[in-house]
Amino acid sequence: MVWCLADLRAYVLVLLVISGLYQGSDQLIPEKCGEDCTPGWDCHFNSYYKYIPNAKSWTDAEFYCQKLYPGAHLASIHSEDENDFLTEITFKNNSNYPVVWVGGSDCYKDRSFVWTDGSQWDYQKWRQWEPSNTGGREPCIDFNFVTPGLWNDEHCDQKFPFICKYTTPCRY
């Protein structure tokens, strides 16, 4: 069966109506919208973040996040506010080794970055001269490399701590 985007949207809308989540607008009704934070996670609006101190390669870190919590991935970043929040989490948990993996990469096509959670690439905050592909392809993104809050492209086999994220539907 071949689905076009309009068919898929209609199918999802039907499922939302049947499940009672759709209330006549484009918004989903959340359970609590970040008011109650999952123990051990840091909350910011309707997203939940967990700093993992164990250094892993980018790929192993992504798999770890997926196993940790349903719907979790390496963190995607969509605003200056969220970027600042992740900087705080990183330094709160480890001021000596602030470099962490986040979920961005251009593994599939050089300079076409995507997030592992499938969300839109709508924000970026690169260090000066980045992304650089220094020493060959550097398809994975680390955060806080040399300068707090700024991004760097890196070889994916490097081992760093990382931040996992999951997001719940929310209406404000």
Swiss-Prot record:
UniProt main location, coarse: secreted
PANTHER family in UniProt: MANNOSE, PHOSPHOLIPASE, LECTIN RECEPTOR RELATED
This protein's name: Lectin
Function: May be involved in protection of eggs and embryos against microorganisms. Calcium-dependent lectin with specificity to D-glucose and D-glucosamine. Can agglutinate microorganisms in vivo.
Record's GO cellular component terms: extracellular region
Other remarks in the entry: Protein synthesis increases significantly under estradiol stimulation.
InterPro entries reported in the protein's UniProt record: C-type_lectin-like, C-type_lectin-like/link_sf, C-type_lectin/snaclec_domain, C-type_lectin_CS, CTDL_fold
Subcellular location(s) of the protein: Secreted
PROSITE patterns, A to Z: C_TYPE_LECTIN_1, C_TYPE_LECTIN_2
Secretion signal span: 1-20
Organism for this UniProt entry: Pleurodeles waltl (Iberian ribbed newt)
Tissue and organ expression note: Anterior part of oviduct.
Residues carrying a glycan: N93
Subunit note: Heterodimer.
SMART domains the UniProt entry points to: CLECT (SM00034)
C-type lectin domain boundaries: 36-172
GO terms assigned for molecular function: carbohydrate binding
Keywords noted in UniProt: Disulfide bond, Glycoprotein, Lectin, Secreted, Signal
Lineage of producing organism: Eukaryota, Metazoa, Chordata, Craniata, Vertebrata
Disulfide bonds: C65-C164, C140-C156
